[in-house]
């Protein structure tokens, strides 16, 4: 059976952890692989605990204008995100998290893959938000994406800040190597290797009530 040429990734964590900016970066990476992209971002209410998530949906087959209830991959930047979004995964979906947050709540047909994300950030003397670059690298590695596309994007994103660009590229590459080791176990759609630059991108924002 031919694999459907679309995928959805959810990034979740505490407010202020760079969730939306990371979703935009991932969306641009997908876009430069030639996919059509739709990004949904939830603006959190601090009264509700400050949890935030963003979903990046991408398709090679058609322009997309909505998010999906079920996703292929969850990048969980804290333990509550694992607990909250496990149910959002498709069968055989993957949760990526820090090894300190690895949960025993995994359900059947859900893969939890834990990595020393915070430890790496600390050892690299990087800001805590840089954990996202490792996570994005793992995602793109799992999807067998083109690392040169990501590296060029970081150069553009941090133009004039070579040290910051190089740090994020290094962290991304470390994550990418982790992700490549998981690529064969992921049964969903894989990214085309070439840079095509032919997709479209759309955004929407969800603001949830405080009660």
Feature map (PLM): residue ranges:
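Fold-independent oxyanion-binding glycine-rich loops
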Residues: 14, 41-43, 59-60, 71, ...
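Conserved small/polar residues in nucleotide/adenosyl-binding loops
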Residues: 204-210
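Short, solvent-exposed amphipathic alpha-helical segments in soluble enzyme
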Residues: 25-29, 90-92, 106
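Anionic-ligand anchoring segments at beta-strand to alpha-helix junctions in alpha/beta enzyme folds, i.e.
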Residues: 7-70, 74
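Short glycine/serine/threonine-rich phosphate/pyrophosphate-binding segments
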Residues: 19-23, 83-84, 206
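Aromatic-enriched
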Residues: 1-7, 102-103, 107-203
């Amino acid at each position: 059976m031919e694999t459907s040429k679309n995928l959805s990734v959810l990034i979740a964590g505490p407010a202020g952890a760079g969730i939306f900016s990371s979703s935009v970066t991932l969306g641009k990476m997908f876009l430069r692989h030639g996919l059509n992209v739709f990004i949904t971002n939830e603006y959190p209410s601090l009264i509700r605990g400050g949890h935030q998530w963003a979903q990046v949906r991408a398709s090679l087959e058609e322009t997309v204008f909505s998010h999906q209830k079920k996703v292929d991959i969850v990048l969980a930047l804290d333990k509550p995100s694992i607990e909250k979004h496990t149910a959002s995964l498709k069968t055989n979906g993957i949760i990526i998290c820090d090894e300190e947050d690895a949960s025993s709540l995994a359900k059947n047909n859900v893969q939890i893959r834990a990595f020393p994300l915070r430890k790496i950030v600390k050892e690299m003397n990087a800001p805590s938000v840089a954990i996202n670059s490792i996570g994005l690298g793992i995602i793109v590695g799992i999807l067998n994406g083109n690392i040169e596309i990501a590296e060029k994007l970081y150069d553009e994103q941090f133009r004039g800040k070579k040290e910051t660009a190089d740090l994020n590229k290094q962290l991304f590459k470390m994550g990418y190597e982790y992700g490549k080791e998981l690529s064969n176990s992921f049964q969903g759609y894989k990214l085309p290797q070439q840079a095509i630059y032919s997709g479209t991108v759309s955004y929407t924002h969800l603001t949830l009530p405080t009660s």
